[in-house]
Amino acid sequence: MTTLDIAPAACAQQCRLGRWLLGAGLLLVLVAGALLLSQRETIRLAAQGYVFGYPLVITDLTRANFVAGMAPTNRLVHVPAFPDARFRDIVRPNVDTLYSLAWLDMNDGPWVFELPASERYAVMQFLDAWTNVFASLGPRTTGTRGGRFLLAGPHWQGQVPEGMTLLRSPTRIAWLLGRVQTNGKADYMAVHAIQA
């Protein structure tokens, strides 16, 4: 597996650049609006630009914090215990599941993801840079049989290996949020075996 280590300073620099670009784009819309458009049209366009760009900036900040503090890009992290009150990685964490998290970069090619067969409830959601769910693996969509999946970015054009299902991300960066049902702390070992 290829991993990419990003230093916290590089993350901060990328986030500053993203915020600067978003601000510059909004300023450009406002200046152009003052010259060519009515005030109402200018406000509407600025609002649309903000609504469009804000999720990308927030997602990148979330990614930068994760890779600076928990794990590098392309590394799956398993949370071994229930979250306590200090847990801030997800807005409202579940208190009956253990999490598996990763930020995946498909710039250098696709990734293989294997979901083991299990009767236990588990869901693996894949989100794009706008935080839209583009794939959700679990009992509702794949049943309990598990499977092998090829996660590819928007421009990948290779052959999907036999026995694998293609999951196409609309963006080069994807966020994996996995949850496995846990029946109390005494059940941790069984969940850890599934996460492995």
Predicted regions and their residues:
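A compositional/structural signature for long, glycine/proline-rich flexible linkers
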Residues: 2-6, 10-196
